[in-house]
Design a protein with these regions (language model features):
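Active-site cofactor/cluster-binding pocket
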Residues: 1-187, 191
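Thiamine diphosphate
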Residues: 1-57, 198-259
Length: 259
């Protein structure tokens, strides 16, 4: 929503490579000027659980704000914080998946971002020609408005962002894995083989949709060992080949690396 109206943005997300899952977090920076790094501190922390607060509260600037999920835990003694019943508000819209939209509405209030920016984005994002599009769009907008309203009642604010200026050139919002995949494709990649593991899974998905035709293809295997041995085999056969994995997956590949 921010980039569509001319703001610059940078996001960074962490998804642990664990079978049982683990703590995940996403960091976003938005500015009217180019954003060159993620930075060391944040203006706002949204903690969905106590672990998130305990882990990241020290990263919040002294004049920053902490929003905590009061449906999950209570926080006392930190005058930078206020509770937001994120899950309860999402349920009240009839869309239990709208918790993140509640948070977006809360953040929009803190920086005084016009609701129209958000509404326009939701309309574009969820208008897909399906029978339930109207209901989905309205529930998400309602969730944002509820988050904004509850946050306004808290009295917290960070001041309004400077008005965005649409650049003369076209801005592109691209994910890191997508940019990497585009680069590999442009470099002549012919064969991609991989096993789904975070955060490499999105590379595999992109390749399955885009590495097609002219003898090029992507292949999902059932283990990391198959992935590395298949990669080596393709290389020996003269193909420009590629795989991607994470720490645990790379450890499993060590057997194949010995070839």
């Amino acid at each position: 929503a921010a980039t569509q109206v001319g703001y610059h943005a940078l996001t960074y997300a962490t998804f642990p490579s664990q079978i049982l899952g683990g703590p995940t977090w996403t960091q976003a920076r938005i500015s009217d000027e180019p954003v060159l790094s993620a930075g060391d501190y944040v203006d706002v922390l949204v903690a969905f659980n106590k672990e998130a607060y305990d882990t990241h509260s020290e990263e919040v600037k002294p004049q920053g704000v902490i929003i905590y999920n009061s449906d999950d835990f209570q926080l006392e003694g930190d005058d930078r914080s206020f509770g937001l019943p994120i899950e309860e508000l999402a349920r009240s819209t009839g869309n239990t998946r709208a918790a993140n939209m509640v948070v977006i509405g809360a953040l929009a209030h803190l920086v005084d971002m016009p609701q129209g920016y958000l509404d326009e984005f939701v309309e574009k994002r969820f208008r897909r020609g399906r029978d339930g599009d109207d209901e989905i769009i309205q529930s998400n907008i309602q969730a944002m408005v509820l988050g904004r309203t509850h946050t306004s009642e808290s009295g917290f604010t960070l001041g309004r962002l400077a008005e965005p200026q649409m650049p003369e050139y076209q801005q592109i919002m691209v994910k890191g894995n997508e940019a990497l995949s585009l680069g590999a494709r442009a470099a002549g990649l012919e064969f991609y083989i991989g096993y789904p593991i975070s955060p490499a899974t999105t590379i595999l998905i992109w390749m399955e949709h885009n590495l097609i035709g002219d003898g090029k293809f992507a292949y999902q295997v059932s283990s990391e060992i198959e992935s590395i041995t298949g990669l080596l085999g393709a290389g020996f056969a003269g193909k420009k080949a590629m795989t991607a994995t994470a720490g645990p997956g790379f450890s499993l590949m060590s057997e194949g690396l010995g070839l």
